[in-house]
Amino acid sequence: MADTERILDAAGELFASRGVAAVDMSDIARASGCSRATLYRCFDNRAALRAAYVHREARTVANRLAELTAAIEDPRERLLTGITHALRLVRESPPLSAWFADTAMGAQAAASSDVVLAMTASFLLGLDGADREAATRRARWLVRVLASFLTVPGRDADEERSMLEEFVAPLIGGRTTTLAR
């Protein structure tokens, strides 16, 4: 476990400094102070390492979002606050924001991660109690929307919040009355 965390920490530092696409397994082995054999014992290949990194960081962001939104009772406000905080947390993290410097890589990582999808669906289930299938469908769409905001940001946080209020909040609840003002 310690090797895995050390490797993922080193990968994050490299992603932030060089960009995700520029980092290979030998770079990560060297930066983490482990042999390539140890690296490959922990991760079958670069795709597996990247997925593990995304999943670990997604859990960290999800835990932080749970703390930041726990006291918000209004589902609409919890949704909007959760999304705006998620965007901020990713943007403020150099290793995470590096994923979205190459738009295809970040969007692909987010959209293909079962962990990101499951955590987003769980967040949505907590808003309106929809069934898991509906929440998962909405989560797939919401992850794409978030990837869009991360790759093509609005002019400022207020503009993004306005777009979320106008377009996302009414749709994500599945019924405009669920999350409408």
Label for each model-derived stretch:
Residues 1-31, 48-51:
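Basic, helix-initiating cap at the start of DNA-binding domains
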Residues 1-12, 158-162, 169-181:
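Actinobacteria-biased recognition of intrinsically disordered, low-complexity terminal regions
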Residues 7-15, 61, 65, 86, ...:
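Short hydrophobic clusters on alpha-helical segments that form packing/core surfaces
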Residues 32-43:
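Short hydrophobic/aromatic patch on the recognition helix
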Residues 50-57, 61:
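Alpha-helical DNA-contacting segments of helix-turn-helix folds
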Residues 52, 66-91, 139:
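Hydrophobic alpha-helical connector segments
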Residues 62, 81, 105-140:
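Amphipathic alpha-helical packing segments from all-alpha helical-bundle domains
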Residues 88-96, 125-127, 140-159, 170-179:
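Amphipathic C-terminal alpha-helical segment
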